[in-house]
Amino acid sequence: MCMIEHIPELVKAGVNSLKIEGRAKSAYYVAVVTNAYRRAIDEYLQNPDGKVSPWIVEELNKISHREYSTGFYFGTEPGQVYSNGGYVRDYDVIAVCEEYADGVATLSQRNRFFKGDTADVLEVGNQPYSVTLNDIYDKDWNPIESAPHAMYLFMTQLPLPTCGVTPIFVFSLPVRSAQCELRSIK
């Protein structure tokens, strides 16, 4: 179920809290969904006649999810999607920020990436943005081409976050798999 494009209806119905459904959702999933809905609600409150920003919908399509519907909210079919029980997963989390100081982010690798990859960065309360990982270093500031294994700590320079709080950066890349390539060909 995805109601991001129906925030006006939810507000007018008196809904004052939302719940993320499902078991074993990742921290990345929760961060993206929470950020997206917070921004969509804020946009609606600032401009009740406007539409949700396209980037918000795009972000929800990047996280691992089953095919979206509005469920039974509008009382129309299909309330439940049966066409494919599998998950849509086009992006992988590649790193999570463990520490940030003086323009340097210390990151913990989650999935494989390489120097020169362009990654999306999720920052609390803001629209995600892209950075190219041109310069990555090990903990001793030796240049590296990629982090060699999961949970490996590495560093890169990043612009000062705009969120005004201790940043939580999550980096994601399009999935590099035969499944993703097949999906894009169709």
What are these regions (language model features)?
Residues 1-175, 180, 185:
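Surface-exposed amphipathic alpha-helical tracts and adjacent flexible/coil segments at the periphery
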